[in-house]
Structure formats: C-alpha cells, structure tokens
A protein has these predicted regions:
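Alpha-helical segment proximal to the catalytic Tyr-Lys
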Residues: 126, 170-171, 246
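Conserved glycine-rich cofactor-binding loop
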Residues: 9, 16-17
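Short, small/polar-rich loop/turn modules that mediate ligand/substrate recognition or access, typified
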Residues: 173, 178, 248-250
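Residue(s) in the substrate-gating loop at a strand-loop-helix junction
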Residues: 141
C-alpha cells in the first residue's frame, strides 16, 4: 500500500528514543522528511547520525528543545515554521501513589504531556488548513481508559490528549486535516526495559519472568501477553498519518493489544 507520505514534512516530538524514534524512522521509510526532537543537542545529533546511517536516502532535521515549556515550543517553531504531519509523542511518566503526587507533579505532567501538544497543534494547524491537508496525532495510551492506580496523574494526561484531539478535529471538519490520538499499550521502550531489568535483579529472576508476571497481574486483560514493540506502534501511526486514512478523524485509535476490554 502506498501511504502517500513522499515529501511530507513530519515533526515528531520526543523522538530520540522509544516510540518517538520508531515513528520518526518509520515515517522516513515511507518517504517523509522528518524533524527529530529531543531536549539536548548532543542527543539529537546522535540520533540524527543513527537515522541517517539507517536510511541514507531520507531527509532528517533536528531541533533540540524542551517542549514541556512554552519557550521550548517557541524554539522549535522558530526553526520549523510549517509541518504537514505533527506527531505529539513527547511524554513523561512515573510510578507514584496518589497521596504522594504534589501540585507541582500534577502541573508538570500536564505541561509536558498535554500542553506541549496543545501549543504545537495551535501553531501548525493554520498552515495545514491553508494547504487543505494535514495530520495531527497525539500519542496517548491505554492508561487513558484504564486509569492506572499507581500513576493517576499520568492517566489523567492521556485522557486529556484524547479530548483535545477530538475537540480539534471537530473544529476543522471538512478541511482535509485530520486529528486523532493513538492509544499505545505497554511498550518495550527503554524505560520499560530498565524497569523490567531492575525488577528482575531485585527478585532474582529473569527479565522474561518479570514480563510474564507483569501481564498476569498488572495487565491481565492484554490479548498479546507481551510488551508491544515501538515499531508496532509506529506502523499504526504511519497509517493514521497517511493519505489513505482520511476516514479516520477525531478517533482514539486503539493499538493497545486488547488491554482495554470495552468494545465501544
């Protein structure tokens, strides 16, 4: 299938590792020009070198900016003035009991996970509308619907992303611009791998056993019974970003391996 992404300019936030990196690589494989983002120039440069070595025919740009701040968003938008595709992937998470989550924590999570995407969408949307084509995608999570008791503040931001995406989509009906969220399931990112390895050492068991225990106890409804790979999420994102996905709009696209049990 031709996804029609040849020459499209895609901005992927938080793309120096994990799902963001996989999305950047996959969109480039489909012919898109990709803007990579991370907080430090050193990290961005390293990932650019890695991506260019992986795909010598692709065009990559890089912007170092902390998009969890308004100033960081301004840094990115001053360098990249337009985009055909915006993937709001930047996000943070931490395990913390509700009674231990401070006001500062709540505001920090909202700024990084929600407001980064709000600010960037507000900036790039007018250009998409003027061209009559564009894609805005928020990388949400199954935690948006299955609020994790161990990180309620994270779940709140993932639900907010779905609401923002739906609201923007309803504001641009019939324009050729689609706005969606993709709900990822538990994914084998660097952070997840570190967590699994740490738990394995603490328990004196293998990483595979920790993963098995995780899906037996923490995510028993998973139909996949393993961590998804970043590349599996990226493949879904690439399709949602494509010219073929015009009928997908305002939707929370579920790519969470069946963790969410509801069918509606």
């Amino acid at each position: 299938m031709n996804l029609g992404l040849q020459g499209k300019l895609a901005v992927v936030t938080g793309s120096t590792a994990g799902i963001g990196y996989a999305i950047a690589a996959t969109l480039a494989d489909e012919g898109a020009r990709v803007v990579v983002n991370g907080r430090t120039q050193e990290r961005v440069d390293a990932v650019l070198a890695k991506l260019r070595l992986r795909n010598r025919g692709a065009e990559f740009l890089g912007v170092a900016a902390d998009l969890g701040t308004a100033a960081g968003v301004e840094t990115l938008t001053s360098e990249i003035s337009n985009a055909d595709i915006l993937v709001n992937n930047l996000g943070i998470f931490e395990i913390k009991a509700f009674l231990e989550i401070t006001d500062t924590d709540w505001f920090r999570f909202f700024e990084v996970n929600v407001m980064s995407g709000v600010r960037l969408s507000r900036f790039y949307l007018p250009g998409m509308l003027s061209k009559g084509w564009g894609r805005i995608i928020f990388i949400s999570s199954e935690s948006a619907q299955n609020i994790p008791v161990e990180m309620v503040h994270y779940g709140m931001t993932k639900t907010a992303q779905i609401s923002v995406a739906r609201g923007i989509a309803q504001s641009v009906v019939g324009t050729g611009v689609t706005v969606n969220s993709v709900l990822a399931g538990p994914t084998a990112s660097e952070g997840a791998a570190s967590f699994v390895e740490s738990m394995a050492k603490q328990q004196g068991v293998s990483a595979a056993e920790v993963e098995k225990q995780f899906f037996a106890t923490a995510r028993p409804t998973s139909l996949l019974k393993r961590f998804e790979t970043p590349e599996e999420i990226a493949a879904v994102v690439a399709f949602v970003a494509s010219t073929q996905a015009v009928a997908i709009n305002g939707a929370p696209v579920r790519a969470e391996a069946g963790v969410v049990q509801s069918i509606l």
